[in-house]
Every structure is written in structure tokens, then in C-alpha cells.
Amino acid sequence: MAIKTYGLMGVDWEERVNYERLRNERLARIKKLLKESEIGALLCFDMTNVRYITATHIGTWAMDKLARFTLLPQDDEPIMWDFGSAARHHQLYCPWLGERSRAGISTLRGAMLPAAGRAEDVARKIRIELEARGLLNEPVGVDAVELPVLFALQEEGIKVVDGQQLMQQARLIKTQDEITLLNSACMMVDAAYDELYRFMKPGVRENECVGLVSKVLYDLGSEHVEGVNAISGERCSPHPHVFSDRALRPGDPAYFDILHSYNGYRTCYYRTFAVGSASQAMVDAYKRCRYILDIAIDAIKPGVTTADIAKLWPKAEEFGFPNEEAAFALQYGHGVGLSIWEKPIFSRLVSLDHPEVIEEGMVFALETFWPASDGWTAARIEEQLVVTKDGCEVITRFPAEDLLVAGVRYYTASGPLPTTRETQSQLNTRANGYLAEGSKDQEALLQA
């Protein structure tokens, strides 16, 4: 076990996460890639990219606003524009930014009237900094942008190009501290699944499961519970990707995806359970789901490509979908870092013709799905892993090698009720021969 799990607080007697090293290594990585590119400066509005470059964070409420932005010029330090009070806070508490933390705001996704000139103000600020460094005639890579801001940048004579790929490349290989944070985030979900397993029983609703998981994570120190997919019963196939208020019933399948952030670093972590018991169809589906996941994990090592992995997975037509686009993200892999989905992507839709090489230090999740033969149950499993020099290490540790049955164990007069059984009781009595013509059980029942 090479990847260590530490306590979450800072101590003087053990080096855990070194946040100064984390900040410096992230910034050095994107600076190096920027220097090697044809881009003169990077302009980022996506909060995860802003955090990667500047190590600033003002809460998840701002994630969809595209209002905060940072400029990273060639051979220079990043400049950060933020909400006024946040900018002042950064000056006081983020010494690595100092006076390069400035007040500035975009249009709040169009909430401010165009006549207010906020888009033009953003563009003017960027032009001034580029001119001061002799970069105005160089391309500026932008990761995501509001259209009014894009048009205003172009009006200022700035050539805007795609900056997403450069940022994705920077975030592709994780530093040692990023890996520690990702491992810590997974540790929290291990604990959440343990509580969830004890909690599930008939009558518990999907939304209650979401509430329990969220509380466990926040109590452990989660920064943000991005989502908990809680899917049960006949909702399992096809996968709806959202929880409801449906109550669990005896014999239900139930699968969950827990997505949260610890100091910015995410989890994507599926587990499947049966409530009380599982049908044979469900057991078989789980075994198939686990098998196609395991053959992928076993193949992971540096030098292998995403195409090599995607080829191991069944085609869409083999599990009920007309094509790979229709089945996208069911047999799937994706990088995990400051975002849930980063490079590299593993999918038969794109990877077979456009493979990416797996490298040491990548962190990604592999997830598989298999619908049961009964037409309504299904299994979903996901493991998050770190690529090592000669293979990989899985950092999602809640047991998943076999289908777990949650809830109380039921007992009959003749002993424990089997955990593999059909949800309809009469199907189990028939299977046991109770109703067979001329059987001893039938004769005894008739005489009674």
C-alpha cells in the first residue's frame, strides 16, 4: 500500500499535505506548459482553473457565474480579479498573490445590463496587462467565457484561442499533494458508504440516503457535496442520474454515486447494494459488471492507451443500446481532480479513434454498468485509482468485490431467509417445490 492516508489537520510532527508545495507545483506546471505553447497568456474564468492557478476559493455558490477571472501571462505571475471583499481577503490571507489580487467583476452571466459596460471593463483590464508586457499581439487562451466578454476582448484587438486544452494538460498529472487530497476525499466516502449500508432498509427514501451521506461528508470536513446519485428499484435501468423520493422496497437494487470535494479535490465513487435480498438476475448482473471493471483495472499501467481499455468493454449493442453515443458514460473512465470529469476520457465513443496514453501520476475513475436479464434491475460499480510506475492502486476502499445485501436479516421457522431470492414470494415457493403436484408439502398442507 504505497498511498498513505493521513489525518486531516496540520501537525508539527508529521508532513501531510504541504499546501505551499501544492500551490507552487501547480503553478509551475501550467507556467511550463504555457511557455512551451504558442499562447501569450491564459485567461481563465472556470473556478477550478482559477483555483489551480491562484489557489483562491470563495465558495461553490460562484461556480456557475463566470464572474471571477485570472490572467497568467508568459514569464510572469498570475493576476486575480474577484468580488471586491474577496479580493481584499486574498490580499490579507493569500500572500502568494498580494497586490495582484484586485477587485473586478464580469456580467454575472448577463444579469447585469449590457449598458453597464462590465464586459468591456473586463476586456479593458486584460488589454492593459497584455500591453504592459508586450503581449497584445499574442494569442490569449481562454477556458470558458461569456459571449459579451468574448466580443469585448475581440474589440480590444485580442486574439482569443482555446485555452481549455492547455489547462486540461496541466491538470492531467497529479502532484503528490493532489494525490493525498484525492485519497483523503475517497476516505470520507468510504465512511459515508459504511453509514449508508447500515441505514438502508425498506421504507427509507432515496432523498433520505442523500441527506445521510451529505451529513457524514460535511461532518468529516467535506468542502462541497456536489451530488449523490441515489437510484433504486425499477429506476435502476435505464440509469436516470438523479435521486428521487422513492422508498426502498424488499429485494430492490440500489446504487449510489457520491461526488464531493475535499480542499477542491473530487470523488466519483459508485457502489451497488441489494435491500434485504437479491434476485439471481441481479446477482448475475453484478458479477458481469464487476468482471468488465476488473479486466480494465488489471490492464492499467503506464504506456497503455485509453483505446486499449475501451476495447475491453462490451459494445453498446451488447447491453441494449443502439450505438455508443446512446450508451455514453455507462462503460466509462474519466480523470478526477479539481473537477469530476477531466482528462483522460475512456469511452468507446471517442477513445478507439483518438487514444490517449496513460502515464504515471494520473488519477482517474473507471465505472461500469450492466442491466439484469429481468429488465428492471441493474448494477453500477466505480473505482477511483492512481497510476503507479508499474500498474495502479485503487483508492476507493468500500467493499465491492461481491454484491452486498443491506438491511436486517430475515428468519423463517426453518432458518434464515436466503439473501438470493426473488422479490415475489410465490416464485420462491415454486422454486422450492412446495406446490409441486403430489409433493409431501402439498399433501401436508391439504391435510391441515
Task: Give the role of each language-model region.
Residues 1-448:
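Active-site neighborhoods and metal-handling regions in enzymes and metal-associated proteins
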